[in-house]
From Swiss-Prot:
Mg(2+) 1 binds at residues 90, 109, 111. GO terms for molecular function: fructose 1,6-bisphosphate 1-phosphatase activity; magnesium ion binding. GO terms for biological process: fructose 1,6-bisphosphate metabolic process; fructose 6-phosphate metabolic process; fructose metabolic process; gluconeogenesis; reductive pentose-phosphate cycle; sucrose biosynthetic process. Homotetramer. One of its GO terms (cellular component) is cytosol. Pathway: Carbohydrate biosynthesis; Calvin cycle. This is Fructose-1,6-bisphosphatase class 1. It catalyses: beta-D-fructose 1,6-bisphosphate + H2O = beta-D-fructose 6-phosphate + phosphate. The lineage of its organism: Bacteria, Pseudomonadati, Pseudomonadota, Alphaproteobacteria, Hyphomicrobiales. InterPro entries: FBPase_C_dom, FBPase_class-1, FBPase_N, FBPtase, Fructose_bisphosphatase_AS. It holds the Pfam family FBPase_C. It is found in: Cytoplasm. Substrate binds at residues 112-115, 199. Belongs to the FBPase class 1 family.
């Protein structure tokens, strides 16, 4: 693709059959809705946008913010002419059913991280497009079946990260032209970055494998990884993912012992599946700690899952620690500064 090529031009040339045309239509519609959402976020209180609760609760039990509701409305309106069988939204208790013969279904989180609005932090939109098989219940396939996935980051610039199953491209919103333009193509997760992201305040609730990995990072040059690490925690899934695509590293949102966190906190259909698809398409990896995220099959619309994503070597190390409890003690003396291979 040419640098600066518009997203609409890419989508116009994508696919020749009904399913791929529907994928292009869905991505284009979500992109159009995201421009409206970006404008609303940019105006903030001037447009009546705040992080104040709207009063109702969404399907996840979170109190909806005003912008959650408006973002949901924008996406539903944008998708009205897209041939879909079902929509699964973070903001809806039930599926929104369309044409059962349509070639695709779509899952999305219209505004991920809306609690960040009042503090002027990054928020985003996440989406996943999957094939629909008439006669088969929607959203019952593993994440590896996704046709397209991506997310929009509403930050200093509004950027759209997209995979159509053949690599990852990043587009940035040209506000004057109200269109997305390509800025990076065939993005690859940097392999060797000394950064990890986790909410360290929950240390006492983590499983031992997570503690072991973080302890390895904290040990720095004296530890088994033989390098100093920086910890990042933005509290915004889309921002964490964008940073990893740009700088590498690993993000952990594990299951833990707190009530309601035993299966993780992020939702499979519209958070962990699309993020995992993007990461793998960019040469990274994504796991629950014990299972590849793209092998997970959701049994309910809002099923939760742990998510560990980023540079493959770090994700694989965390998986090793989960699957082999002896891995932590076996590795530490071999590679530490004062271990077998260092003096």
């Amino acid at each position: 693709m040419d640098q600066g090529q518009t997203l609409s031009r890419l989508l116009d040339s994508y696919g020749t059959d009904a399913r791929t045309r529907a994928v292009a239509a869905a991505v284009g519609a979500i992109a159009e809705a995201s421009i409206e959402i970006s404008d609303l976020i940019g105006q903030g209180a001037l447009a009546g946008i705040t992080g104040a609760a709207h009063g109702a609760s969404n399907a996840d039990g979170d109190v909806q913010k005003d912008l959650d509701v408006r973002a949901e409305a924008a996406i539903v309106a944008a998708l009205k002419n897209v041939p879909y069988a079902a929509l699964a939204s973070e903001e809806s208790d039930t599926l929104l059913m369309g044409d059962p013969q349509a070639p695709i279904s779509i899952a999305y989180d219209p505004l991920d991280g809306s609690s960040n609005i009042d503090t002027n932090m990054t928020v985003g939109t996440i989406f996943s497009v999957i094939p629909n098989e008439p006669g088969v219940a929607p959203f019952t396939a593993p994440g590896s079946c996704q046709l397209a996935a991506g997310f929009v980051v509403y930050g200093p610039q509004t950027s759209l990260v997209l995979t159509l199953g053949d690599g990852v491209d990043i587009f940035t919103l040209d506000r004057a032209a109200k269109t997305y333009r390509l800025i990076r193509e065939r993005v690859q997760v940097p392999a060797d970055t000394a950064e990890y992201a986790i909410n360290a305040s929950n240390h006492r609730h983590w499983e031992q494998p997570v503690r072991d990995f973080v302890d390895e990072c904290l040990a720095g040059t004296d530890g088994p990884r033989a390098k100093n690490f920086n910890m990042r925690w933005i509290g915004s899934l889309v921002a964490e993912a964008y940073r990893i695509l740009t700088r590498g590293g690993v993000f952990l949102y594990p299951a833990d012992s707190r009530p309601g966190y035993g299966e993780g906190r992020l939702r499979v259909l519209y958070e962990t599946h699309p993020m995992a698809f993007v990461m793998e398409q960019a040469g990274g990896a994504a796991s629950t700690g014990r299972e590849r995220v793209l092998d997970v099959v959701a049994s309910t619309t809002h099923q939760r899952s742990p998510l560990i994503m980023g540079s493959s070597d770090k994700v694989h190390r965390i998986v090793e620690l989960h699957l082999d409890p002896a891995a932590a003690s076996r590795t530490a003396p071999l590679f530490g500064r004062r271990g077998l291979f260092r003096t």
